[in-house]
Amino acid sequence: MEFLTNDKLTIVGAAGMIGSNMAQTAIMMHLTPNLCLYDPYAPGLEGVAEELFHCGFEGMNITFTSDIKEALTGAKYVVSSGGAARKAGMTREDLLKGNAAIAEEFGKNVKAYCPDVKHVVVL
């Protein structure tokens, strides 16, 4: 099976609906055999990883972790859908404030753990 690259792709927010769909799409598009799934919510992340393992995608090296350093170290491509979910009673402004802090921390982590990253996409 041919892939576009052998470089590591990390999906941030992989336990969520968008992130888990991005992971499956990346696999089906044969982007890379080296896929790392990251989410701070470990139980949900494990469930997503197990679903992908059960699909039996050939030639894939799928790893998952709730450790941001492990997830980003060596990554050449990063796609992030990670952010706070909107809760009852929250305004868009409240959500923006929370997500701004998350985005700031994400940027610092990318700089620290994968300074040679080629592309970062934030959804």
Locate each region found by the language model:
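N-terminal Rossmann-fold NAD(P) dinucleotide-binding loop
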Residues: 19-20
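Generic hydrophobic/aromatic pocket-lining and core-packing "Φ" positions
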Residues: 23-24, 107
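A short, Lys/Arg-enriched amphipathic alpha-helix followed by its capping loop at the start of a domain
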Residues: 25-31
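Rossmann-like NAD(P)(H) cofactor-binding subdomain of soluble oxidoreductases
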Residues: 91-123
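Conserved N-terminal Rossmann-fold NAD(P) cofactor-binding segment
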Residues: 6, 31-76, 84, 90
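Conserved glycine-rich cofactor-binding loop
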Residues: 15
